[in-house]
Amino acid sequence: PQTGYDDTRALIAEWHGRGRLHYAVTPRFAITSSPEQLEMAGQLMREFPDLHMQTHLSENHAEIAYTQELYPWSQDYTDIYAHYGLLGPKALFGHCIHLSEREADVLSDSGSVAVFCPTSNLFLGSGLFDYHRYRRRAKPLRIAAASDVGGGTNYSMLRTMDEGYKVIALQGEKLNPFASFWQITLGNARALSLEGRIGTLDAGSDADMVVLDARATPAMALRMETVSALAEELFLLQTLGDDRAVREVYVAGRAAIPS
């Protein structure tokens, strides 16, 4: 643990705040972390309060049960991270599928973020993230949408929200395409506490933009022949679009992919 702590401090000094880079403290999850490692992760968050912290929470029932065996003193999975000082507005918890009401309240009260990883959750059969319930509850959760680098099947946010739509539909709800595109732009920026820099086209924001082509493939072009509203075009991009629909990318106003 001490070596990991020292190495992390060195990486923070080297990279955090360099240009647009942000360092995230990343304990893999409670199962693979010793109490000493989690304690030192919490210490880093206290020493560097502007850092993000990302880890894994309540993905499947077997994982939850095993975690409780390893930390029998805890009320629940979330209580472990709370005990070590790893909750807060900069804390991002992947999955969060099987949260109890108490856990959801704790995450909400602390401002922590539940990260929706639909391609991973469907691929692994982990369960269905209750997006609308988490947003509508008396103590709503902050939510991000992500690919999950480990279990996800695609890095595209279009594909991510297409699978997210299916997860929500399996629970008898729908996700409006405007809500989908809000989630992967300003919604995710807010989840990262970076809405002052990214996520909008407001004056003063970094000019990070993606130009999408709703006629990128023959199937999309055919479907566009009957599209008459922006919501339909966005839904088409979400359900049929992928990396082929990306025409141009601008990072801080500079073209990353030639037009």
Where are these regions (language model features)?
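Metal-coordinating catalytic core of metallo-dependent amide/deamination hydrolases
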Residues: 1-94
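Structural detector of well-ordered beta-strand residues that form the stable sheet scaffold
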Residues: 53-54, 92-94, 115, 144-146, ...
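Conserved, mostly hydrophobic/aromatic
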Residues: 25, 41, 56, 81, ...
